[in-house]
């Protein structure tokens, strides 16, 4: 029956007589969820992508070529050595500090990825990673992980005021938005 069809008075009274005494059923099995907004779906996809990118870049098998003489340092090919010198001197002041003391390698890798993702999201260009000295496990791994990330421009052992031999200052490239 379409909406344009009209019931006659006899048909309407016959229907009311037939359903007289019946109770309205309570619908309790199907839950109607509101349709999702397209922007909500885009936001969910973006957050999933960011979550995947937090740990994606760090491999334990890949070993980049880092200088073994002197304090730990690294600069991409397109980065001036002057930037590394500025990191060493403490010209760049870190806005974010990541303390890895007591973390296991997997946890440290995940936190490092989260810190880099946070810095990129908040447009923070300099961060400090405090790996500590301890058994030298994280002290050896953190530079290898940082050198693999495409947004890390350079890093250098931190000056004494930012942690000295137990920390690394990281310079990140912030994409133009």
UniProtKB/Swiss-Prot annotation:
Any one Gene Ontology BP term: rescue of stalled ribosome
InterPro entries of this UniProt entry?
A: Smr_dom, Smr_dom_sf, SmrB-like
Q: Which PROSITE patterns match?
A: SMR
Record EC number: 3.1.-.-
Keywords, alphabetical: Endonuclease, Hydrolase, Nuclease, RNA-binding, rRNA-binding
What is the top-level taxon of the source organism? Bacteria
Class of enzymatic activity (EC top level):
hydrolase
Question: Is Nuclease one of the keywords UniProt gives this record?
Answer: yes
Q: Which SUPFAM superfamilies match?
A: SMR domain-like
Any one Gene Ontology MF annotation carried by this entry is: RNA endonuclease activity
Tell me which residues make up the Smr domain: 98-173
Q: Which Pfam families match?
A: Smr
Please give the family membership noted in the entry.
Belongs to the SmrB family.
Q: What does this protein do?
A: Acts as a ribosome collision sensor. Detects stalled/collided disomes (pairs of ribosomes where the leading ribosome is stalled and a second ribosome has collided with it) and endonucleolytically cleaves mRNA at the 5' boundary of the stalled ribosome. Stalled/collided disomes form a new interface (primarily via the 30S subunits) that binds SmrB. Cleaved mRNA becomes available for tmRNA ligation, leading to ribosomal subunit dissociation and rescue of stalled ribosomes.
Q: How is the subunit organization of this protein annotated in UniProt?
A: Associates with collided ribosomes, but not with correctly translating polysomes.
What name does the UniProt record give this protein? Answer: Ribosome rescue factor SmrB
Q: Which organism is it from?
A: Aliivibrio fischeri (strain ATCC 700601 / ES114) (Vibrio fischeri)
């Amino acid at each position: 029956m379409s909406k344009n069809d009209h019931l006659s008075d006899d048909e309407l009274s016959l229907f009311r007589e037939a359903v007289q005494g019946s109770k309205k059923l309570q619908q309790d099995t199907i839950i109607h969820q509101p349709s999702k907004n397209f922007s909500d779906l885009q936001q969910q996809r973006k957050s999933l992508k960011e979550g995947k990118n937090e740990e994606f870049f760090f491999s334990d098998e890949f070993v980049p070529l880092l200088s073994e003489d002197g304090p730990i340092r690294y600069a991409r090919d397109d980065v001036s050595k002057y930037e590394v010198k500025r990191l060493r001197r403490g010209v760049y002041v870190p806005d974010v500090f990541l303390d890895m003391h007591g973390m296991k390698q997997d946890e440290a890798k995940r936190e490092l990825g989260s810190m880099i993702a946070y810095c990129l999201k908040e447009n923070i260009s300099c961060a400090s990673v405090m790996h500590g000295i301890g058994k030298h496990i994280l002290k050896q791994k953190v530079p290898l992980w940082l050198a693999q990330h495409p947004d890390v421009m350079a890093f250098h052992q931190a000056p004494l005021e930012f942690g000295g031999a137990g920390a690394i200052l990281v310079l990140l490239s912030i994409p133009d938005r």
